[in-house]
């Protein structure tokens, strides 16, 4: 019944032109509530900021990514810096990606998205850990815990993007908003060298409103130029059917 209700709700959403959505707000202002569901199925991008306890969810509109909404992180654990060992209860930092098999609609923590730790960088440094998630229930032992209401919306948009053809959803996790002022404030940190590898990814998105293309070379993150064209185009919610939540 829930699946049927969701489908009917989407079909009843009034149609608006995509041009109208583009003109509705700037790239740093959240999309208005009446437009949100009409963007379901469009490509998305996630940024997490530990110090600010914020998860920003972006949706592709035209050639750039627009802030869909910001969500407060209930809890994360272990303080600033990358996760290094299984059992250190530390929440990861770095560049990750999510595919469909990493979605957990029946998680013991309501709903969950496995971020894909360890990635190539983590493995190159011998970092260990598993089951690192963005999930609900506001409980964290190394994950990013959201309210159930928050993870509901995040999960729907990530699922929609992947089902509709986005190969993977990038998740960039930063210790803080990596402005020059914040970098200076943390210049004596033991993680300074690591954070300087993350900053080009943050800066690239700030300048272009497009997710950075990141690789790992000789055990270091390297931000490179993205492909000139993306095959996935934004779609409206009326073209998309949500899977039934378990």
UniProtKB/Swiss-Prot annotation:
Pathway membership: Cell wall biogenesis; peptidoglycan biosynthesis
The record's section on Pfam families has:
YkuD (PF03734)
Query: Which residues does the Swiss-Prot or TrEMBL record annotate as the active site?
Result: 135 (proton donor/acceptor), 143 (nucleophile)
| Signal peptide stretch | 1-19
Listed CDD domains: YkuD_like
Which keywords does the record carry? Cell shape, Cell wall biogenesis/degradation, Glycosyltransferase, Hydrolase, Peptidoglycan synthesis, Signal, Transferase
Q: Which family does it belong to?
A: Belongs to the YkuD family.
Put simply, this protein is called Putative L,D-transpeptidase YafK
């Amino acid at each position: 019944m829930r699946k049927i209700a969701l489908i009917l709700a989407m079909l009843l959403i009034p149609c608006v032109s995509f041009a109208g959505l583009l003109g509705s707000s700037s790239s740093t202002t959240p999309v208005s509530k009446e437009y949100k569901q009409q963007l379901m199925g469009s490509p998305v991008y996630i940024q997490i900021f530990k110090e600010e306890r914020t998860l920003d969810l972006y949706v592709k509109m035209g050639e750039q990514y627009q802030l869909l909404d910001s969500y407060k992180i209930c809890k994360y654990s272990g303080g600033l810096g990358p996760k290094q060992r299984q059992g250190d209860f530390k929440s990861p930092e770095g560049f990750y990606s999510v595919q469909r098999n990493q979605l957990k609609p029946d998680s013991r923590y309501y709903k969950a998205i496995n971020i894909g730790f360890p990635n190539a960088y983590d493995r190159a440094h011998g970092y260990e850990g598993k089951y690192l998630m963005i999930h609900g229930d506001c409980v964290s032992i190394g994950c990013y815990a959201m309210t159930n209401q928050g993870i509901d919306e995040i999960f729907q948009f990530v699922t929609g993007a992947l089902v509709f053809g986005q190969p993977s959803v990038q998740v960039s996790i930063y210790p803080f908003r990596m402005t020059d002022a914040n970098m200076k404030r943390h210049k004596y940190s033991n993680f300074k060298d690591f954070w300087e590898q993350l900053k080009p990814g943050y800066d690239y998105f700030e300048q272009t409103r497009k997710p950075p293309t990141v690789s790992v070379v000789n055990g270091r993150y390297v931000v490179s130029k993205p492909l000139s064209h993306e095959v996935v185009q934004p779609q409206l919610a009326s073209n998309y059917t949500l899977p039934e939540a378990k």
